[in-house]
Amino acid sequence: MRRILGLLLLASLAFTAYAGDKTTDIFKEDGTVRVECKASYKRNGMSTADLANILTGISTIKGTQYYSQSKKEVTTLFTDAYTVEEPDYAKKTADKHLEAPLPQKIDIFGMLEDSRFGENVYQFSYVFDENHIILKITNIAPMRYSFLKAIDTNCFTCLLDIALTEDEIVVNNKGFCKPAVLPSFMESRINNAITNRMDALFGWFEKGITE
């Protein structure tokens, strides 16, 4: 019964976050875990600047949930999230707020703390056009699982590609991660952790445009 309730809650969360046409594919090729997610949503009058400020609101990643296969329940994935001033000096600062006209490019650093890999600083790189936004999220230091290095620097990447048409927001997201060499008994666990985090980052943005 507990598992059924967890699945029902997950379905409810997914409907809230992905209230549009959506397909997700997860596969592994040449040791690289890949996630691809395509979706479309009603634009509802949102501007490029509106979407940009959803993406720069790094603190809103805090509390993002997922369904844990090991715990058989919906649980919090990112327990903390905030913008930092410098990658090597993780001092918390306010989220970046942008006004039109948007800059062509900006880089922001964010600290994300999660239940599996602990605290890690990521680089959020943005490219803005009139009706198009690309966000690349990359780890800038090794990510560890307990005492083991699970992911090398610059080996975890989420790419959010967002285009605005007259009536829709079209999302084409891709995630890539090549884990470090790990004991065979840990590979499946780490691969699942990677795909969960990619899907959660995609869902964070998509939830922001549907709430």
Tell me the role of every PLM-derived stretch.
Residues 190-211:
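Surface-exposed amphipathic alpha-helical segments
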Residues 121-128, 157-164:
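Hydrophobic/aromatic beta-strand elements that line small-molecule binding cavities or substrate pockets
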Residues 146-151, 177-197:
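A short acidic/glycine-rich loop-to-helix N-cap element
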Residues 128, 137-141, 173-177:
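A mature extracytoplasmic/lumenal domain signature
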Residues 19-116:
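Hydrophobic ligand-binding cavity/cleft-lining segments
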Residues 2-7:
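Sec-dependent signal peptide recognition
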Residues 10-19:
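Hydrophobic h-region of N-terminal signal peptides that target proteins for export
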Residues 158-189:
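A short, solvent-exposed beta-edge/loop patch
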